[in-house]
Amino acid sequence: MSTSFENKATNRGVITFTISQDKIKPALDQAFNKIKKDLNAPGFRKGHMPRPVFNQRFGEEVLYEEALNIVLPAAYEGAVAELELDVVAQPKIDVVSMEKGQEWTLTAEVVTKPEVKLGDYKDLTVEVEASKEVTDEEVDAKVERERNNLAELVVKEDAAVEGDTVVIDFVGSVDGVEFDGGKGDNFSLELGSGQFIPGFEEQLVGAKAGDTVEVNVTFPENYQAEDLAGKAAKFVTTVHEVKAKEVPELDDELAKDIDEEVETLDELKAKYRKELEASKEAAYDDALEGAAIELAVENAEIVELPEEMVHDEVHRSVNEFMASMQRQGISPDMYFQLTGTSQEDLHKQHEAEADKRVKTNLVIEAIAKAEGFEASDDEIEKEINDLAAEYSMPVEQVRSLLSADMLKHDIVMKKAVEVITSSAKAK
């Protein structure tokens, strides 16, 4: 196979490559065997037409397209490898010549990975807004959240105030006509929770059990049900009960109810302080790492980022997001209906970060290359075992899902990130 590459523009060019007859002939045989089972010819049983008869009747050229589909992937990948090109995105393949008995010549318009000119990426000094310090107020707030989780709702006679829970029936209508989803019975609503559309909960403050309140609201313009968006609605609401939240006393008994491993409130606070310190330490390290990587990317120069790389990243990100939604039982149609968005909106949302992620990956890859990082067999094996433990999967299943090249790439990328972050300091 002969190959050549011609630059056409920055990060773009054309590969010309040939496919020899010793590769074409087996591909033609495969193509014939694939289609002959459906062939009928006088004097032959279906699927048993001899190759010479086929060639005489239809011509060998009929097999070329199928044969090319068989032989092309390996031929193209071989040309890319021989030319040592780092290709991104799908190529545009064109046939130059496909003559009987001759080698086939093809071209591939390709986009290549852009050149990265690294700037400073070691000993960086960065701004980190996160703090490692844990305050008494943060500890008290965590105790208070757990205390509220143990609160009980007690029926009261007085009028409802914000924070109370009301048990209601409601019937909604627009222009006097009831609408789907606008009716509820014995619904528990915490006033001030924001569960209902703006303005609804506020109008129930002051209501008592037995009251009927006419709640008038306007649906938001971006409401997910388009037929209701921006429209004025009336909800006839009957209050059955008003319940106040009663929280337990803040004492040692509460501490033991929250966490059976402690005996006193002071012990609970000390435990929460340690947990918060560990959490804030991790958040600080993440913030330092993120800021250092961001600065390393800013310090680098990327020569004309191909738009195809960004488009591919957007599609990858969107597909990953939708797969995550479906694992939660939310179909694409359901997601778009609930959020009042479209496929186009979702792509636009992901475009904002796609450009940044592509640039970041390119710079980290360039650092790994500059540092000469490689992945040993032992490191690959450790990575497989770590992933198996993290996702509770059999080691062999992880090995079958991830190629050695993917694992090597992940390992050297982690090493490059470590180079950036290990020497970074906060201002």
UniProtKB/Swiss-Prot annotation:
One of its GO terms (biological process) is protein unfolding. GO terms for molecular function: peptidyl-prolyl cis-trans isomerase activity; protein folding chaperone; ribosome binding. The gene is tig. It comes from Streptococcus equi subsp. zooepidemicus (strain H70). Keywords: Cell cycle, Cell division, Chaperone, Cytoplasm, Isomerase, Rotamase. Consists of 3 domains; the N-terminus binds the ribosome, the middle domain has PPIase activity, while the C-terminus has intrinsic chaperone activity on its own. HAMAP family: Trigger_factor_Tig. Involved in protein export. Acts as a chaperone by maintaining the newly synthesized protein in an open conformation. Functions as a peptidyl-prolyl cis-trans isomerase. The lineage of its organism: Bacteria, Bacillati, Bacillota, Bacilli, Lactobacillales. The keyword Lipoprotein does not apply. Belongs to the FKBP-type PPIase family. Tig subfamily. This is Trigger factor. GO terms for cellular component: cytoplasm. It is found in: Cytoplasm. Its EC number is 5.2.1.8. PANTHER family: TRIGGER FACTOR CHAPERONE AND PEPTIDYL-PROLYL CIS/TRANS ISOMERASE, TRIGGER FACTOR-LIKE PROTEIN TIG, CHLOROPLASTIC. Residues 163-248 form the PPIase FKBP-type domain. InterPro entries: PPIase_dom_sf, PPIase_FKBP_dom, Trig_fac, Trigger_fac_C, Trigger_fac_C_sf, Trigger_fac_ribosome-bd_bac, Trigger_fac_ribosome-bd_sf, Trigger_fact/SurA_dom_sf. It catalyses: [protein]-peptidylproline (omega=180) = [protein]-peptidylproline (omega=0).
